[in-house]
A protein has these predicted regions:
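A cytosolic small-molecule/anion-sensing beta-strand core signal
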Residues: 54-55, 71, 89
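Short strand-coil-strand connectors
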Residues: 27, 61-65, 88
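Short, conserved beta-strand element in jelly-roll/cupin
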Residues: 44-60
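Short, surface-exposed secondary-structure edge patches
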Residues: 41, 50, 65-68
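A short, N-terminal "cap"/entry segment at the start of jelly-roll beta-barrel domains
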Residues: 1-33, 40-42
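Short histidine-centered beta-strand/loop micro-motifs
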Residues: 21, 38-45, 62, 86-87
Length: 97
């Protein structure tokens, strides 16, 4: 699931991302920069992940479906789901889950 930050209204300087029952205890947190020569290659694993785009634009592929993402977008990745991220320029993002 991809939640477009641009579609969420800001109230009192906050945006509420509705993630439903996708709540997880966080045991992984990493800030990454992806570039054309340093793509985030396809992988899958048994843990749910959340990606939050800080700066730049990229293409996220989840189970073969490609979606353009940019600043303030939140990507929810279910366990055992193929996922990757590529950027034509660069993108700074956080991975946690």
């Amino acid at each position: 699931m991809i939640i477009k930050g641009s579609a969420i209204p800001e109230v009192n300087f906050r945006k509420g991302y509705e993630i439903g029952d996708a709540q997880e205890q966080i045991d992984h947190f990493a800030m990454r920069i992806t570039t054309p020569v340093n793509p985030f290659e396809p992988e899958k694993h048994g843990e749910q992940r959340f990606w939050y785009i800080l700066e730049g634009e990229a293409t996220v592929t989840i189970d073969g479906e490609c979606t353009a993402v940019g600043p303030s977008d939140l990507i929810l990745i279910a366990p055992w789901t193929d996922h990757s991220l590529r950027a034509d320029n660069w993108v700074r993002w956080i991975c946690f889950g």
